[in-house]
Amino acid sequence: MSFSDWINSSYPNPGIDGQWRWLHITVLIFCIGLIVAFALIFRKRSLKTRKIVLWCLVGTILFFEITRRIINLVKMNGGGNFNDYLYTLLPRPWCAIACWSIIIATVFNKKFLYNFASMTALLCALVFFAYPGAGFNNQYILFENLYSISTHSLLLVTSISLITLKFTRFEYKNIWKEGICLAVILAYVFLEIYGLKIESDPMYFMPGNDVMDIFGVGYSTYLAIYIIFVIIYFNVFYLIDDRKNVVARFKHKNNLDNDEESRKSYEIIKNVLNSKLI
């Protein structure tokens, strides 16, 4: 195998069942080790130090994203139409979109962007490591395999590190900002599918996708499960991080309900007494 074969991923690479084998498990353990190490070492360090750690992670993601695009452009050798270039240059699947969400969040340094990026990147990473459809499933680790394994590993480490290193703050009062981010991503995804026609199912909600086949259910049932899961998944972050306000609101509502019940009881007793006096 030459370097050209490796970098262009052109060397014959038979498929294997690599899920939950030694490489898959080793990479996952390594990622968990990095997450724990970053949290223990850098959590209480200065913001400047924590940003250096973040930029190192994001810089590595950016390196893989740019390198892959350069390689694919070189392979095109000036051929192809406009759509082929869009297919090569734009982030298409959800995982690639998550990579660029993290990059954009770090560049603009906004809390709500960190929030959204960490949630969506973590989901992509968890799905990949639970059921990897690429990367581990070939005999050789060519560049495309390395890209897939590395970017998903970086998504896992970076998404959790954004939380442990205190770049995120999930509050229900600001959830509308993350909601706008999700709406923008959905609009981009529909543009990919129906407008640009460069990806058939970036977020795995269209009929006939691999995840639906795993569940073995009809599309209507799958879509309902998908929507419910996404709602619950995103709310978990707020229920944990904003739990004090959630509990306070719950107690306040209970107090209001109790006050209302007391007022109604008082009115009933008052009316009964008045009727007896009359």
Model segments located where?
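Alpha-helical transmembrane segments in multipass membrane proteins, preferentially the mid-helix core
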Residues: 33-40, 101-103, 154-173
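Membrane-interface helix-boundary motifs at transmembrane edges
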Residues: 41-55, 107-115, 165-176
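N-terminal topogenic module of multi-pass integral membrane proteins
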Residues: 1-52
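Hydrophobic core of alpha-helical transmembrane segments in multi-pass integral membrane proteins
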Residues: 24-43, 58-67, 183-190, 227-239
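Membrane-proximal helix-loop-helix units in multi-pass membrane proteins
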Residues: 101-163
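Short, highly charged, low-complexity non-transmembrane loops/tails of multi-pass membrane proteins
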Residues: 244-277
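Membrane-interface transmembrane-helix boundary segments in multi-pass integral membrane proteins
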Residues: 12-29, 175-184, 196-238
